[in-house]
């Protein structure tokens, strides 16, 4: 039997590969070149938390998990830093970033760490409104799901620390979306529905996702009035999805992970780009601004954007730390750090270690690694290990 190839189909596949490669180059170039946060002429505005309805299960629901701790919590609005921009940016660079860890704002005791985490969320939000720079949201995402949510869902009794963390989660619901004119920013990924109402916009935005465990995000735009409407949609591309980890002076990516004996290599988050679809068709445009994928178009009510972020394991190395150190290398998947379920102070993780992928009874991805004595060590998300 002979097989006749469709030339146009072959060319189409090549064009898609070329477009994806072009997008990868743009994203990586942005990672290298974006060093200074440029201030906007007019700051953005967050969509108020009261306009955002969150739904879902477990730690996907920022507000819901926080209200389990204290049902009376109310979101505090995060505002632009205004005239204090230069001072706030200096404090961010000289005080906040140098102390930032893989999951939180600092390595201090629990009380101070929760306070610093909450302050970081407020700082990041105010500076983001002045710059529209995704790096502020990258670190916010890491702190929210790396340390704050962990404290909120931990089995420990209600305490000052748990209350502080819960308040920060509630405040962050007012940072999920931002607007300016006909521009809409999607900053954080969580199941939500919001009514975006301004002089230029009057739309319903639905977001459906399995983040932070799954990499698929669906965004639906519905107009209140009849006919079509124009929106310039900005969807954040997380730093971890393109090989960027802040602060870069302290941490670097490594894509040497081997899962079930197969090197992730070219399919790692560093070399595999996020994929965007509009109404089921892949978008091959390559407009990226300040770490956001931009879709500028006139929409029909009910149009959908779907994003697939690479959710493969990767390693983060601490700059300047001896490779023989137990804490020199850390395992991540998406925004979540993975740690041993059983505490083992002598276990040393290295980038060339073999990973076996498995999952828990409730479907959470896990990784098994053999130690020097051939004992199996199971790694689970830090957020769920106490």
What do the predicted segments below correspond to?
Residues 27-35:
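Hydrophobic h-region of N-terminal signal peptides that target proteins for export
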Residues 49-79, 83-89, 112-128, 162-172, ...:
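Well-ordered alpha-helical segments within folded domains of soluble proteins
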Residues 49-52, 56, 60, 84-103, ...:
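Long, well-ordered core segments of solenoidal/helical folds
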Residues 109-112, 121-137, 143, 147:
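Contiguous mid-protein beta-loop-alpha structural module that forms a pocket-lining wall or clamp
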Residues 225-233:
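Extended extracellular/luminal ectodomain segments enriched in beta-structured repeat modules
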Residues 39-54, 137-223, 245-277, 282-288, ...:
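C-terminal beta-rich recognition modules with glycine/proline-rich loops and embedded aromatic residues
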